[in-house]
A protein has these predicted regions:
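Residue-level hotspots at or immediately adjacent to binding/recognition sites across diverse folds
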Residues: 2-386
Length: 386
């Protein structure tokens, strides 16, 4: 659901990575623009995934453990810290702001009374929105339902994400029963954000320091373990000044390919995300501004689809490009032009870069990469002078 959209963006490459990722590593350009660091995993783990790199180089995400559970982590100064859970086995940190406040979702030890598996871990435990501060995990309220999650946090500690209501959505396939809505948390209070038209469900994916929130709304669908989402997002949305703005689309109107969804907004009001193309069979990354509206960012040459996940203050966009076989490459867009990030790294890079999930104001990037042995790890790509 909700935050699992971002997990899809940063983890969807796993199916094709083992077969194709390392073969492509030898094709890098000799031009040096980034030094890549493998941030590794928690002890005993074999997989990690990132979601945000803040302007102090702190990365939020999750790592597997020796028992294959997944725990929220922060990487800081080369050190990985397990943030823990709310008593259950799994958690993910989808966000960290520049003051070090982290947020995400964490399982409790209590079974969901409706048998739902909201966070997709397969445990059917209640999974709550959570903030990690001062070494502890602090749950946030829902909108009357049992589950939710934080996707982003701005500098002032206002969080954006998703939460269930107490109302059932008859369109939701089992095991999901309850509606879920976009939400902002301010001073510990959950504030429901409106969805577009008659859309029953939605989620907030990003928030900037001015309180502008982005996300999407649509209809509940079956949880897809490959896409890690059960929202068919029909409308990409912006919430600002108490007003809902439909950002439009690139021709696709049903959300059946991947959907129309805004993932991030910078402090200049520039929005990035994904939109289905006409016919709703494939999707492209987009950049939206108030002046130019939605623009198609395209793909790497020859690829079939793309997604834009993050944008920094200078307007550099990162995400991924996908070929017809589902293989992915990390992408950076400058001036609307996509470049394979693997062509900009040192030949000694320890990883082939599958996705770019976040970029900070200094241009440092985090995402998923694959090692020579086939493990998928979090990386940090640091710009270097030529």
């Amino acid at each position: 659901m909700k935050s699992r959209v971002v997990s899809f963006l940063c983890a969807m490459s796993l199916m094709a990575a083992i077969a194709t990722g390392m073969a492509a590593q030898a094709q890098q350009s000799p031009t040096l623009h980034y030094a890549v660091v493998d941030l590794g995993t928690l002890p005993g783990g074999t997989f990690s995934q990132p979601f945000v790199i803040n302007d102090n180089d702190v990365v939020s995400g999750s790592s597997s453990l020796a028992n294959n559970n997944q725990n929220a982590v922060l990487w800081e100064h080369g050190r990985i810290t397990n943030l823990g859970t709310l008593g259950g086995p799994n958690s993910i940190a989808f966000a960290v702001n520049d003051l070090g406040l982290a947020g995400g979702e964490a399982e409790t030890s209590t079974s969901d009374p409706n048998g739902e598996d909201f966070c997709g871990f397969g445990t059917h435990l209640i999974c709550l929105p959570v903030l990690w501060l001062g070494g502890g995990a602090h749950p946030l309220p829902t909108l009357g339902g049992n589950n939710g999650g934080v996707n982003r946090i701005n500098l002032w500690g206002i969080a954006a994400g998703v939460a269930e209501t107490a109302s059932e959505d008859p369109a939701c396939p089992a095991p999901q029963k309850l509606q879920f809505k976009p939400v902002a948390w301010e001073f510990g209070r959950a504030i429901a954000l409106p969805t577009e038209g008659s859309d029953p469900d939605g989620l907030a994916m990003g928030i900037n320091d001015y309180g502008q929130v982005v996300g999407g709304s649509g209809i509940c669908t079956a949880f897809n373990p490959n896409l890690l989402i059960n929202l068919q997002s029909v409308h990409a949305l912006l919430w600002q000044n108490g007003r809902l703005v439909d950002l439009g689309n690139l021709g696709g109107t049903t959300g059946q390919a991947l959907g129309n969804l805004a993932y991030a907004i910078n402090n200049r009001g520039q929005v990035v995300g994904v939109s289905d193309l006409s016919g709703d069979t494939t999707f492209h990354a987009f950049l939206w501004t108030a002046a130019t509206k939605m623009q198609d960012l395209g793909t790497l040459p020859g690829d079939a689809a793309s997604l834009a996940i993050s944008i920094n203050e200078p307007g550099v966009v990162v995400g991924l490009s996908i070929d017809a076989s589902g293989n992915t490459r990390a992408v950076v867009w400058r001036g609307g032009v996509p470049t394979d990030l693997n062509t900009l790294v040192q030949p000694s890079s320890p990883l082939y870069l599958l996705t770019s999930c976040s970029i900070n104001a200094r241009g440092e990037i985090t995402g998923l990469g694959i090692t020579a042995s086939g493990e998928v790890h979090t990386y940090r790509a640091i710009p270097i002078q030529d």
